[in-house]
């Protein structure tokens, strides 16, 4: 399949996976079969010959903003949330390596005994060698979401596109789980996402993507094989761009 790489529009991609996606039907933590399916979807894209990076959230373990609402110092809460992303990254790495996928975890918060520190040149070199790079620790700064981290890392790695895996198959004008008449956008501009206060990503992340002309594609992680389909312009998704 790697011989088809020249026919693909996107050759270097970053996948954003929320922590909640790793829970499956659980209320907390990880569901192995769900993580295995995600890893299999990633392998399918690697087999196409693409360079792949991942940013993983931590909401299945800890949400800093929620802790701040009940009285914890926001910066401290966010740092704990960053540690949760490292736990998720190591879990995903373990499952991916069990499938024969060469994987490296790079953390914005140095943890030398468990993973590599984030160094841009090293991360790019790993990707050139067709290793999957999982970026953990968010941006390394409080008050920043993992969506912002995903946009920043995608730009730093010179990725062609950012793919955001969610619980729904695209961007809607309201929550389709609550509103059966919600309208789906097949394409939408950065400006309209911001002006319409759509909750697909935080405003800061969308603004940085717009400034750097990074296209974003939103799709459902629930359907097995969707990652490879979406990167080949197939399946259901919404593209955010100019």
From Swiss-Prot:
GO terms for biological process: 'de novo' CTP biosynthetic process; UDP biosynthetic process. Coiled coil: none annotated. It catalyses: UMP + ATP = UDP + ADP. Keywords: ATP-binding, Cytoplasm, Kinase, Nucleotide-binding, Pyrimidine biosynthesis, Transferase. It holds the Pfam family AA_kinase. The keyword Membrane does not apply. UMP binds at residues 58, 78, 139-146. GO terms for molecular function: ATP binding; UMP kinase activity. Catalyzes the reversible phosphorylation of UMP to UDP. Pathway: Pyrimidine metabolism; CTP biosynthesis via de novo pathway; UDP from UMP (UMPK route): step 1/1. Homohexamer. The keyword Ligase does not apply. Its main location: cytoplasm. Belongs to the UMP kinase family. Inhibited by UTP. Signal peptide: none annotated. The lineage of its organism: Bacteria, Pseudomonadati, Pseudomonadota, Alphaproteobacteria, Rickettsiales. Its EC number is 2.7.4.22. This is Uridylate kinase. It is found in: Cytoplasm. ATP binds at residues 16-19, 59, 63, 166-167, 172, 175. GO terms for cellular component: cytoplasm.
